[in-house]
UniProtKB/Swiss-Prot annotation:
The lineage of its organism: Eukaryota, Viridiplantae, Streptophyta, Embryophyta, Tracheophyta. The keyword Nucleus applies. It comes from the Eukaryota. This is Protein VERNALIZATION 2. Coiled coil: none annotated. Involved in the regulation of vernalization; this process in essential for flowering in cv. Bd29-1 but seems do not occur in cv. Bd21. One of its GO terms (cellular component) is nucleus. Mainly expressed in leaves, and at low levels in the shoot apical meristem (SAM). Pfam families: CCT. Induction: Accumulates in leaves but not in shoot apical meristem (SAM) meristem during vernalization in cv. Bd29-1, but expression is independent of vernalization in cv. Bd21.
Length: 219
């Protein structure tokens, strides 16, 4: 087993591990004590991977170039773009593009929607016309109603005509019906005397028969 020539350690000594890494910087930076494990490190290359958590800051030249690009807008005209926010706002305030009209059933989608709207309006107009008939239809309905009313009143007219003829035959006094005189009155029936009713009942073959006899008494 080989030993380290500096610390007399085994092959797993930090010096052997350091030797396996390539050395890119031959300058000797000041010793930095990151941990007790690296107290033998002189050049500090073994702990270089610990400094990778914080990336290096940009160089002044790159920073100046980036600032110049932001100031000049990448055109190198030497002027500031003061109206750039206004242009961005105008871009945001632009109207959206109109919807794309796609073909649909032999025509455009807009034409199809227009036809459907027209058909709906026509249907509503037909329904309104059905509820509100025209003048000719109204006249025809009125004539049918009058004819039906005449036929319904035909019997009443006959009855009224007969009553009218009978009223014309009756005598009138100053437009009013006059009483019929006694000579024209029909003769009254003769007066009759008292009557007596005699009832007799008898039984025949188990049936009771009641016989009633009326006799007029002399006055």
């Amino acid at each position: 087993m080989s030993t380290c020539g500096m610390c007399a350690g085994s092959s797993y000594c930090p010096h052997h591990q350091r030797a396996s890494w390539p050395a890119h910087d031959h300058r000797s930076p000041p010793p930095v004590e990151y941990h007790d494990f690296f107290h033998h490190s002189v050049q500090g290359q073994a702990a270089a991977w610990l400094r990778l958590d914080n990336p290096p800051l940009p160089q002044p030249a790159e920073h100046d170039q980036a600032a110049a690009g932001m100031i000049h807008g990448g055109h190198r005209h030497g002027t500031f773009e003061l109206n750039r926010p206004l242009m961005d706002d105008q871009h945001l305030l632009q109207m959206p593009p109109p919807p794309t009209i796609m073909p649909f059933g032999g025509g455009t989608f807009g034409d199809t929607m227009g036809r459907e709207a027209i058909m709906a309006v026509d249907g509503e107009m037909m329904m309104v016309a059905a509820h509100h008939p025209t003048m000719h239809e109204r006249e025809a309905k009125v004539m049918r109603y009058r004819e039906k009313k005449k036929r319904r009143r035909y019997e009443k007219q006959i009855r009224y005509e007969s009553r009218k003829a009978y009223a014309e035959m009756r005598p009138r006094v100053k437009g009013r019906f006059a009483k019929v005189p006694g000579s024209a009155a029909p003769p009254s029936p003769p007066p009759s005397g008292p009557r007596i009713y005699i009832a007799s009942c008898f039984k025949s073959n188990g049936t009771v028969i009641v016989q009633e006899v009326m006799h007029d008494l002399p006055i």
